[in-house]
Amino acid sequence: VLRASAAGEAAGVPSSTLVCEGFMGLAAASSIGLGMPNLPVARVVGHPGVQSKEMLERNVLEVTLEAVIDNLLKAPKSTGKGDEPGARDVIAKGGFQEINDYFYDHGLSDGLPIVPPTREKVEAFLRFTDRDPGESLGALLPDSRAATIWSIAVNGVMAGCRPEYMPVLVALIEAMADPAYGVEHSGNTPGGETLIIVNGPVIKQLGFNYTQGVMRDGFRPNTAIGRFWRLYLRNVAGFLPHQNDKATFGNTWRVAIAENEDLLKKIGWEANSADFGFAPGDSTVTIARYTGGNHISSVSGATPESMMPYLYDAVIRQYSWQLMFTVGQGMGTLRPLMLLSPIIAETIAGWGWSRRDLKRRLFEHARIPAREFERILRDWTQKPTWNLAEEARAGRIPKVFHESDDPGRPVPLVWKPEDYMLAVTGDLTRNSVYVFAHNGVLGYPVAKRIRLPRDGEGRIRNG
C-alpha cells in the first residue's frame, strides 16, 4: 500500500495510507526506502481483527479520520536518515571485540560474532568472481540499496564464508533481486524463512553436507552460506526486527541444504534444478520462503503404494491458511516442498516411478473436501463467502476444483502436479520425509546458475 501511496505522491496526488499502530515504525522505515521519508500515514488503533464493529468504528472516527484529513492537507515532518558510509569507507577500527561491539550496536550483525570485513579479506573474495565490485544486481526493497558485488563480499566475510564460496553468494543475491521471488515480503507477519537448495558439481567442490543432518549447522558451507543470506537481508535489503521486519514470532535463518546427486544418478531421477530448466552438470541455487515444516518419521512400506498414504497425509496436515496462495491472494502460487530421504526415493524409483509420477500421485491424492477448502479460505481471508464452483466457472481457477457439485468432493492443494517440489537429501538409511509450508507469492521459488570465474575450479581446488 505504501508503494501505491508513493506513486500517487510522486504524481502530485495527495495520499494517506492507513497503518495499524504496530506497523508505524515499519511504515516510517519503508517510506525512507521508497525515497519519500515524509510519506503520509494515518494510525489505525490496535488491530482491526480483534475489535468489535463498534470499537473499530469509534477508533477510526476519533483517531484515524483526523489523521487522514491532516495528511491530505499537509505533509508530515521528515523522518529521513543521515548519509550512509561509502562502500569502501572504514567505519570502525579496533580489536576483534571492539569491531563486533560496533557492528552490533549499529544493527549490522545478527547478534553472533562476525568476522571483521577488512579490505584484505573482502578482496580475497573478489578474486573468485570476474565481475566488477561496483556492479549492482538490483535495488533491494525495502531500503532500496544496491546489491553490489562488493557488498556481497563484505557480508560473505562477516558470515564466516570462505572466499571460494563467492560464486554461490553472487547467485543467491541474483535470486534475491529477482522480482519473482519478492524480497520485499521478507519481513511479513508469518516470519517465513528462506531455504536454499544447492545442486550440481559445486556441492562436492565446496564440501556441502548432503547426507545425515543436512539441515543441522556444523558444516561450514551449509551453515555460513545460510547465515550470509540473513545478514544480507539485514544489512542491504534492510530487514531489521522492530523496523522493517515485522514477523510476529519469526524464525532463525536456515542452513543451506544440498541434494544427494549420487543417489539421484543411481536411481535415474532428475535433480530439483531440472524443474527450473537447468541441465545436468549445472551448479545452481534455488530459494523459496517457508513459514514452517514438519518431519515425518517411519514412512514404512516395501512399495510406493504402501508408502504414499504417509506422504499424502504429511502434505495435507501441513497446509491451512497457506491455501490462500492456491485460491485467493496468490492464485496458483503455492509450491509445497517435500524432502525425501534417499531410502524413500530409492524404494519409490525401484518400482519404476519417476519424479513426475510422484508429483502426479501427490496431486491426485493429497486432497481435502471442497467444503473444508472453502471453510479455510473463509476463516483465513477477509472474504466471508468462498465458492470454488463459481471461481472455476469464471475461469479464475482450474476446473479440477469443480468436477461436481458435491461439497464433499476431494480437491487438490495446488493447481497442477508440477507445483510440487521434491528434493532428495538427508540420512541414507532413515525412512523419513520433511514437508515445508510454502509462503506462496510472498517468497516464490527462484533458481539461478552458479557461474564460476575463469579457471574457477582450479581456484577452488587451490583455496
Give the label of every model feature segment:
Residues 21-25, 49-50, 344-346, 428-430:
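Short Gly/Pro-enriched loop/turn and capping motifs at secondary-structure junctions
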Residues 14-18, 50-59, 211-222, 297:
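Flexible, glycine/proline-enriched loop segments at strand-loop-helix junctions
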Residues 30-34:
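Short low-complexity, flexible loop/linker segments enriched in glycine and/or proline
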Residues 2-28, 38-44:
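Short, acidic/small-residue loops that bind anionic groups at enzyme active sites
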Residues 85-463:
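Non-transmembrane, aqueous-exposed alpha-helical and coiled segments at domain scale
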Residues 1, 17-25, 120, 163-165, ...:
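Gly/Ser/Thr-rich loops at beta-strand to alpha-helix junctions
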Residues 45-80:
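A charged, well-structured terminal subsegment
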